[in-house]
Protein backbone atom coordinates (compact mmCIF):
# COMPACT_ATOMS: atom_id res chain seq x y z
CA UNK A 1 0.00 0.00 0.00
CA UNK A 2 2.81 2.41 0.83
CA UNK A 3 4.14 2.05 -2.74
CA UNK A 4 0.84 2.97 -4.40
CA UNK A 5 0.26 6.61 -5.29
CA UNK A 6 -2.57 7.96 -3.14
CA UNK A 7 -2.73 4.46 -1.70
CA UNK A 8 -5.03 5.47 1.12
CA UNK A 9 -7.74 6.50 -1.34
CA UNK A 10 -8.01 3.18 -3.18
CA UNK A 11 -9.06 -0.31 -2.22
CA UNK A 12 -6.35 -2.89 -2.90
CA UNK A 13 -7.73 -6.29 -3.91
CA UNK A 14 -6.19 -9.76 -3.96
CA UNK A 15 -6.85 -12.26 -6.75
CA UNK A 16 -5.24 -15.61 -5.98
CA UNK A 17 -5.27 -19.02 -7.64
CA UNK A 18 -4.78 -22.38 -5.96
CA UNK A 19 -2.19 -23.92 -8.29
CA UNK A 20 0.11 -24.63 -5.33
CA UNK A 21 -2.64 -24.92 -2.72
CA UNK A 22 -1.82 -21.44 -1.41
CA UNK A 23 -4.78 -19.36 -2.61
CA UNK A 24 -6.27 -18.77 0.85
CA UNK A 25 -2.87 -18.24 2.49
CA UNK A 26 -1.85 -15.68 -0.14
CA UNK A 27 -5.17 -13.85 0.17
CA UNK A 28 -4.75 -13.62 3.95
CA UNK A 29 -1.18 -12.38 3.46
CA UNK A 30 -2.64 -9.66 1.28
CA UNK A 31 -5.00 -8.63 4.08
CA UNK A 32 -2.05 -8.46 6.48
CA UNK A 33 -0.36 -6.08 4.06
CA UNK A 34 -3.24 -3.69 3.56
CA UNK A 35 -5.63 -5.31 1.07
CA UNK A 36 -9.23 -4.35 1.70
CA UNK A 37 -10.87 -6.72 -0.77
CA UNK A 38 -10.50 -10.42 -1.58
CA UNK A 39 -11.70 -11.89 -4.86
CA UNK A 40 -12.94 -15.39 -4.09
CA UNK A 41 -15.48 -18.02 -5.11
CA UNK A 42 -17.80 -20.45 -3.35
CA UNK A 43 -16.07 -23.83 -2.92
CA UNK A 44 -12.97 -22.33 -4.56
CA UNK A 45 -14.18 -23.16 -8.06
CA UNK A 46 -12.36 -21.41 -10.85
CA UNK A 47 -9.80 -21.66 -13.61
CA UNK A 48 -7.18 -24.43 -13.42
CA UNK A 49 -6.87 -25.51 -9.77
CA UNK A 50 -9.45 -22.95 -8.66
CA UNK A 51 -9.53 -19.64 -6.84
CA UNK A 52 -9.45 -18.60 -3.20
CA UNK A 53 -12.43 -20.25 -1.48
CA UNK A 54 -14.84 -17.76 0.09
CA UNK A 55 -15.73 -20.10 2.94
CA UNK A 56 -12.07 -20.60 3.88
CA UNK A 57 -11.01 -16.97 3.89
CA UNK A 58 -14.19 -15.75 5.61
CA UNK A 59 -13.88 -18.25 8.45
CA UNK A 60 -10.13 -17.65 8.77
CA UNK A 61 -10.78 -13.93 9.22
CA UNK A 62 -13.54 -14.71 11.72
CA UNK A 63 -11.68 -17.30 13.80
CA UNK A 64 -8.46 -15.22 13.82
CA UNK A 65 -10.13 -11.82 14.00
CA UNK A 66 -7.89 -10.92 16.93
CA UNK A 67 -4.91 -11.19 14.56
CA UNK A 68 -6.19 -9.85 11.25
CA UNK A 69 -8.44 -7.10 12.65
CA UNK A 70 -10.50 -7.48 9.47
CA UNK A 71 -14.21 -8.13 9.19
CA UNK A 72 -16.70 -9.11 6.49
CA UNK A 73 -20.45 -8.78 6.18
CA UNK A 74 -20.88 -12.41 5.18
CA UNK A 75 -23.66 -14.27 7.00
CA UNK A 76 -21.55 -17.30 7.93
CA UNK A 77 -24.60 -19.38 8.87
CA UNK A 78 -25.56 -19.55 5.19
CA UNK A 79 -22.13 -20.81 4.04
CA UNK A 80 -22.88 -24.54 4.13
CA UNK A 81 -26.25 -24.25 2.40
CA UNK A 82 -24.88 -22.00 -0.34
CA UNK A 83 -21.93 -24.35 -0.81
CA UNK A 84 -24.32 -27.22 -1.46
CA UNK A 85 -26.40 -25.09 -3.83
CA UNK A 86 -23.30 -24.27 -5.88
CA UNK A 87 -22.33 -27.94 -5.87
CA UNK A 88 -25.78 -28.83 -7.16
CA UNK A 89 -26.05 -26.20 -9.89
CA UNK A 90 -22.51 -26.60 -11.22
CA UNK A 91 -22.31 -30.38 -10.94
CA UNK A 92 -18.88 -29.98 -9.30
CA UNK A 93 -18.74 -32.13 -6.12
CA UNK A 94 -17.26 -30.83 -2.89
CA UNK A 95 -14.42 -33.17 -1.80
CA UNK A 96 -15.13 -34.88 1.56
CA UNK A 97 -11.89 -33.45 3.01
CA UNK A 98 -12.62 -29.89 1.82
CA UNK A 99 -11.94 -27.35 4.55
CA UNK A 100 -15.03 -25.84 6.21
CA UNK A 101 -17.71 -27.41 3.98
CA UNK A 102 -16.48 -30.97 3.29
CA UNK A 103 -18.38 -33.89 4.79
CA UNK A 104 -15.39 -34.77 6.98
CA UNK A 105 -14.65 -31.23 8.17
CA UNK A 106 -16.31 -31.88 11.54
CA UNK A 107 -16.02 -35.69 11.61
CA UNK A 108 -13.88 -37.55 14.14
CA UNK A 109 -12.95 -41.22 13.74
CA UNK A 110 -9.81 -41.57 15.86
CA UNK A 111 -10.58 -42.83 19.36
CA UNK A 112 -8.43 -40.24 21.09
CA UNK A 113 -10.01 -37.49 18.98
CA UNK A 114 -13.52 -38.71 19.79
CA UNK A 115 -12.71 -38.78 23.49
CA UNK A 116 -11.34 -35.25 23.33
CA UNK A 117 -14.36 -33.93 21.44
CA UNK A 118 -16.76 -35.51 23.93
CA UNK A 119 -14.94 -33.87 26.83
CA UNK A 120 -14.33 -30.51 25.16
CA UNK A 121 -15.17 -29.89 21.48
CA UNK A 122 -12.70 -27.03 21.15
CA UNK A 123 -9.87 -29.53 21.65
CA UNK A 124 -10.13 -30.66 18.02
CA UNK A 125 -12.62 -28.21 16.49
CA UNK A 126 -11.33 -24.73 15.77
CA UNK A 127 -14.89 -23.50 15.18
CA UNK A 128 -18.47 -24.50 15.90
CA UNK A 129 -20.18 -26.25 13.00
CA UNK A 130 -23.29 -24.17 13.63
CA UNK A 131 -21.33 -21.04 12.65
CA UNK A 132 -21.53 -22.14 9.02
CA UNK A 133 -25.06 -23.52 9.23
CA UNK A 134 -24.21 -27.16 9.87
CA UNK A 135 -26.53 -28.10 12.67
CA UNK A 136 -27.78 -31.57 13.55
CA UNK A 137 -31.43 -32.31 13.02
CA UNK A 138 -33.32 -32.26 16.31
CA UNK A 139 -36.44 -33.93 14.93
CA UNK A 140 -36.47 -37.41 13.39
CA UNK A 141 -38.66 -37.22 10.31
CA UNK A 142 -40.28 -40.44 9.12
CA UNK A 143 -43.49 -41.68 7.57
CA UNK A 144 -45.46 -40.93 10.75
CA UNK A 145 -44.26 -37.32 11.01
CA UNK A 146 -46.86 -34.61 10.65
CA UNK A 147 -46.81 -31.50 8.51
CA UNK A 148 -46.06 -29.22 11.47
CA UNK A 149 -42.89 -31.15 12.37
CA UNK A 150 -41.91 -31.23 8.70
CA UNK A 151 -42.32 -27.48 8.35
CA UNK A 152 -40.34 -26.88 11.56
CA UNK A 153 -37.50 -29.04 10.22
CA UNK A 154 -37.46 -27.02 7.00
CA UNK A 155 -37.26 -23.78 8.97
CA UNK A 156 -34.38 -25.17 11.04
CA UNK A 157 -32.55 -25.87 7.78
CA UNK A 158 -33.03 -22.26 6.71
CA UNK A 159 -36.09 -22.63 4.46
CA UNK A 160 -38.25 -19.94 6.03
CA UNK A 161 -39.60 -18.36 2.83
CA UNK A 162 -41.56 -21.32 1.48
CA UNK A 163 -45.17 -20.76 0.49
CA UNK A 164 -47.91 -23.01 1.84
CA UNK A 165 -48.28 -24.54 -1.62
CA UNK A 166 -44.55 -25.35 -1.74
CA UNK A 167 -44.68 -26.91 1.73
CA UNK A 168 -47.71 -28.97 0.68
CA UNK A 169 -45.94 -30.36 -2.41
CA UNK A 170 -42.69 -31.00 -0.53
CA UNK A 171 -44.55 -32.77 2.28
CA UNK A 172 -46.31 -35.05 -0.20
CA UNK A 173 -42.99 -35.98 -1.82
CA UNK A 174 -41.39 -36.46 1.61
CA UNK A 175 -44.14 -38.88 2.72
CA UNK A 176 -43.77 -40.82 -0.53
CA UNK A 177 -40.02 -41.29 0.04
CA UNK A 178 -40.34 -41.93 3.80
CA UNK A 179 -42.77 -44.77 3.07
CA UNK A 180 -40.08 -46.45 0.95
CA UNK A 181 -36.91 -45.86 2.98
CA UNK A 182 -37.84 -44.77 6.50
CA UNK A 183 -36.66 -41.61 8.33
CA UNK A 184 -34.79 -38.90 6.42
CA UNK A 185 -31.65 -37.19 7.70
CA UNK A 186 -31.16 -33.42 7.57
CA UNK A 187 -28.89 -33.82 4.53
CA UNK A 188 -31.46 -35.96 2.73
CA UNK A 189 -34.24 -33.51 3.53
CA UNK A 190 -32.17 -30.62 2.16
CA UNK A 191 -31.41 -32.54 -1.04
CA UNK A 192 -35.11 -33.32 -1.43
CA UNK A 193 -36.09 -29.65 -1.04
CA UNK A 194 -33.52 -28.43 -3.56
CA UNK A 195 -34.46 -31.04 -6.15
CA UNK A 196 -38.17 -30.22 -5.88
CA UNK A 197 -37.79 -26.42 -5.81
CA UNK A 198 -35.94 -26.31 -9.13
CA UNK A 199 -38.09 -24.12 -11.47
CA UNK A 200 -37.65 -26.53 -14.41
CA UNK A 201 -37.88 -29.74 -12.39
CA UNK A 202 -41.50 -30.15 -13.52
CA UNK A 203 -41.17 -29.10 -17.18
CA UNK A 204 -40.98 -32.82 -17.89
CA UNK A 205 -42.59 -34.97 -15.21
CA UNK A 206 -41.77 -38.62 -14.69
CA UNK A 207 -45.07 -40.46 -14.38
CA UNK A 208 -43.71 -44.01 -14.45
CA UNK A 209 -40.47 -45.91 -14.97
CA UNK A 210 -39.83 -49.64 -15.00
CA UNK A 211 -36.95 -51.74 -16.24
CA UNK A 212 -35.95 -55.35 -16.68
CA UNK A 213 -32.35 -56.43 -16.39
CA UNK A 214 -30.31 -59.36 -15.18
CA UNK A 215 -27.80 -62.00 -16.17
CA UNK A 216 -28.61 -63.15 -19.69
CA UNK A 217 -31.43 -60.60 -20.11
CA UNK A 218 -31.50 -57.64 -22.48
CA UNK A 219 -31.89 -54.48 -20.36
CA UNK A 220 -35.25 -52.95 -21.28
CA UNK A 221 -36.93 -49.85 -19.87
CA UNK A 222 -40.38 -48.32 -20.22
CA UNK A 223 -41.09 -44.73 -19.21
CA UNK A 224 -44.16 -42.53 -19.13
CA UNK A 225 -43.35 -38.82 -19.18
CA UNK A 226 -45.71 -35.87 -18.89
CA UNK A 227 -44.66 -33.17 -21.35
CA UNK A 228 -46.22 -29.78 -22.17
CA UNK A 229 -47.88 -31.56 -25.13
CA UNK A 230 -49.29 -34.43 -23.09
CA UNK A 231 -48.19 -37.84 -21.83
CA UNK A 232 -45.65 -39.84 -23.79
CA UNK A 233 -44.92 -43.55 -23.40
CA UNK A 234 -41.74 -45.14 -24.73
CA UNK A 235 -39.84 -48.41 -24.41
CA UNK A 236 -36.19 -48.97 -25.30
CA UNK A 237 -33.31 -51.38 -24.78
CA UNK A 238 -29.80 -50.42 -23.76
CA UNK A 239 -26.41 -51.56 -22.51
CA UNK A 240 -27.70 -51.39 -18.93
CA UNK A 241 -30.78 -50.22 -17.02
CA UNK A 242 -29.70 -46.55 -16.93
CA UNK A 243 -28.80 -46.54 -20.62
CA UNK A 244 -32.15 -48.14 -21.47
CA UNK A 245 -34.05 -45.61 -19.34
CA UNK A 246 -32.22 -42.66 -20.91
CA UNK A 247 -32.86 -43.88 -24.45
CA UNK A 248 -36.55 -44.37 -23.62
CA UNK A 249 -36.74 -40.85 -22.16
CA UNK A 250 -35.09 -39.34 -25.23
CA UNK A 251 -37.67 -41.03 -27.42
CA UNK A 252 -40.52 -39.85 -25.20
CA UNK A 253 -39.51 -36.17 -25.03
CA UNK A 254 -38.15 -35.85 -28.56
CA UNK A 255 -34.72 -34.56 -27.49
CA UNK A 256 -31.44 -36.43 -27.87
CA UNK A 257 -28.82 -34.50 -25.88
CA UNK A 258 -25.31 -35.84 -25.30
CA UNK A 259 -24.60 -37.13 -21.79
CA UNK A 260 -21.35 -35.47 -20.64
CA UNK A 261 -21.47 -36.33 -16.93
CA UNK A 262 -23.17 -38.98 -14.83
CA UNK A 263 -22.47 -39.19 -11.10
CA UNK A 264 -24.14 -41.20 -8.34
CA UNK A 265 -23.68 -40.59 -4.63
CA UNK A 266 -25.40 -41.61 -1.42
CA UNK A 267 -26.46 -38.56 0.58
CA UNK A 268 -25.74 -40.43 3.80
CA UNK A 269 -23.66 -43.52 4.47
CA UNK A 270 -26.29 -46.22 5.02
CA UNK A 271 -27.66 -48.68 2.48
CA UNK A 272 -31.09 -47.08 2.97
CA UNK A 273 -29.77 -43.64 2.06
CA UNK A 274 -31.36 -41.49 -0.59
CA UNK A 275 -29.40 -41.66 -3.82
CA UNK A 276 -28.53 -38.44 -5.62
CA UNK A 277 -27.72 -38.54 -9.32
CA UNK A 278 -26.14 -35.60 -11.13
CA UNK A 279 -25.99 -35.39 -14.91
CA UNK A 280 -24.75 -32.82 -17.39
CA UNK A 281 -26.35 -32.80 -20.83
CA UNK A 282 -25.22 -31.00 -23.95
CA UNK A 283 -27.38 -30.10 -26.91
CA UNK A 284 -25.46 -28.19 -29.55
CA UNK A 285 -23.97 -25.13 -27.84
CA UNK A 286 -26.19 -25.48 -24.78
CA UNK A 287 -25.52 -27.45 -21.61
CA UNK A 288 -27.51 -28.07 -18.45
CA UNK A 289 -26.96 -29.81 -15.13
CA UNK A 290 -29.74 -31.90 -13.62
CA UNK A 291 -30.13 -33.57 -10.24
CA UNK A 292 -32.45 -36.37 -9.18
CA UNK A 293 -33.08 -37.65 -5.65
CA UNK A 294 -34.75 -40.95 -4.79
CA UNK A 295 -34.16 -44.13 -2.75
CA UNK A 296 -34.20 -45.89 -6.15
CA UNK A 297 -31.06 -45.07 -8.18
CA UNK A 298 -32.74 -45.81 -11.52
CA UNK A 299 -35.59 -43.45 -10.67
CA UNK A 300 -33.10 -40.83 -9.46
CA UNK A 301 -31.24 -41.22 -12.77
CA UNK A 302 -34.44 -40.64 -14.72
CA UNK A 303 -35.35 -37.58 -12.62
CA UNK A 304 -31.88 -36.09 -13.12
CA UNK A 305 -32.05 -36.56 -16.90
CA UNK A 306 -35.50 -34.96 -17.08
CA UNK A 307 -34.35 -32.10 -14.84
CA UNK A 308 -31.49 -31.23 -17.21
CA UNK A 309 -33.57 -31.87 -20.32
CA UNK A 310 -36.23 -29.53 -18.96
CA UNK A 311 -33.67 -26.74 -18.74
CA UNK A 312 -32.59 -27.36 -22.32
CA UNK A 313 -36.18 -27.35 -23.55
CA UNK A 314 -37.34 -24.34 -21.50
CA UNK A 315 -34.50 -21.97 -22.37
CA UNK A 316 -32.76 -22.10 -18.98
CA UNK A 317 -29.60 -23.85 -20.18
CA UNK A 318 -26.19 -22.19 -20.31
CA UNK A 319 -24.03 -21.75 -23.38
CA UNK A 320 -21.27 -24.35 -23.59
CA UNK A 321 -17.76 -22.97 -24.24
CA UNK A 322 -16.19 -24.48 -27.38
CA UNK A 323 -13.63 -27.24 -26.96
CA UNK A 324 -10.05 -26.87 -28.21
CA UNK A 325 -10.90 -29.16 -31.13
CA UNK A 326 -13.88 -26.99 -32.06
CA UNK A 327 -11.79 -23.82 -31.88
CA UNK A 328 -9.23 -25.37 -34.23
CA UNK A 329 -12.03 -26.34 -36.62
CA UNK A 330 -13.39 -22.81 -36.48
CA UNK A 331 -16.73 -23.87 -35.00
Curated annotation (Swiss-Prot):
UniProt EC number: 2.3.3.13
Recorded catalytic activity of this chain's protein: 3-methyl-2-oxobutanoate + acetyl-CoA + H2O = (2S)-2-isopropylmalate + CoA + H(+)
GO function terms (MF aspect): 2-isopropylmalate synthase activity; metal ion binding
Pathway: Amino-acid biosynthesis; L-leucine biosynthesis; L-leucine from 3-methyl-2-oxobutanoate: step 1/4
GO biological process: L-leucine biosynthetic process
Sequence segments annotated as region (Regulatory domain): 205-331
First-tier enzyme category under EC: transferase
Listed name of the protein: 2-isopropylmalate synthase
Organism: Thermus thermophilus
Phylogenetic classification of the source organism: Bacteria, Thermotogati, Deinococcota, Deinococci, Thermales
